[in-house]
Amino acid sequence: FSLLIYGASISDYFAYGFYNSRPSGRNEYITFRRYHKIMCVANKKEDINLCRNKIDFNNHFASLLGRQWIDTKSATKEELLLFITNYPIFFVKDILGFRGDGVKRIDSSQISVSTYLEDLVKQNDAHYILEEPLTEIESIQSFHPWSINTIRIVSLYDAKNEVVNFMNARIRIGNKKNNVDNFHYDGIGANIDINTGIITSLGYDTHNKTYITHPITHKQILGFQIPKWDECKSFIETACRLLPTVRYIGWDLVIKQDGT
C-alpha cells in the first residue's frame, strides 16, 4: 500500500515510521519514487553513471577518497600482488554493484593469491576493484566492529546560488557480524538530525524491528552524537562542487580512526 500510494520502499517505510503515521504525515517525505523523480530533474543524465561506476567515481573524487584501491583489469599482476602485500586483508567490489552485493572481504593468508587474481581478471561478465580495509573512529566502530558503519547524507546542490542543501541523513550499522551495513544484509538504520548530528530515532531494520541498543554489542543508538559532524557536512559541500551537474546525491561517509 505504501509503495503504491506514496512510492515508499521498505527502507523508507521503517526510516520514516510509516507504520505509526497518518496518511497526511506520510505524504511529507521524499520516498523512493519521489527520490527518482528528483534525480531525473536535478541530475544530468550523461553524468549520473559517474556515481554508479566505482572506477569513474574513484577517479573523479580522488582528492577526497581517502583510501587506496586498484583496478583488477588495468593493473598488472605485479601491481596487484604488491597491493595485496601492502593490504593482506582487502575488499573486492564489483564496480557496478550496489546494496552490498558483490562485496567480499578477503584474507590473503587463506587463499592462493595468484589463482584468485587470475580468476577475477578472467571473468568477462564482471569487473572488480580491490580496496584497502578502513579502520573507522572507535565510537562508531563499536556499534558493530565486523563491518564499516557508514553515514548516508543526501544533498541537493543549488547550482544557481552555489548552495548545498542537506535533505536528510542516517547512520547505517551492520548486524549479525556481516561485513556490510546494508539493509539487504540485515543492517540497521537510524535517522540523524541534520543540524546537530544526533541520532533522533530508534534503530530500525527491514524486519519491522526497532532497537534502542544494538542487538549484539548493546551500544545505545538513540541519542548518539555523530563525531566530527560539522566536518562531515563541510566534506559533502566540497564534494558537491566537484560534480555540479549531478545535484541530488546520497553520499556514504566513513569517519576514519584519525578523524578524517
Language-model regions, residue ranges each:
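Core nucleotidyl-transferase/polymerase catalytic module
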Residues: G203-T206, H214-Y248
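Short amphipathic alpha-helix with an adjacent loop that forms part of the alpha/beta core around
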Residues: E79-T85, D119-V121
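Phosphate-binding site of ATP-dependent enzymes
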Residues: V113-G203
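Conserved metal-phosphate-binding beta-hairpin within the catalytic cores
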Residues: L242-T260
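Conserved N-proximal alpha/beta basic substrate-recognition cap immediately N-terminal to
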Residues: F1-L82, F98, I236
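ATP-grasp fold ATP-binding core
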Residues: N58-F61, I84-R105, D125-Q141
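Domain-scale recognition of functional cores that engage charged ligands
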Residues: C51, I55, T72-L80, R99-Y116, ...
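Active-site rim elements
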Residues: K44-I48, E138-S142, Q220-I226
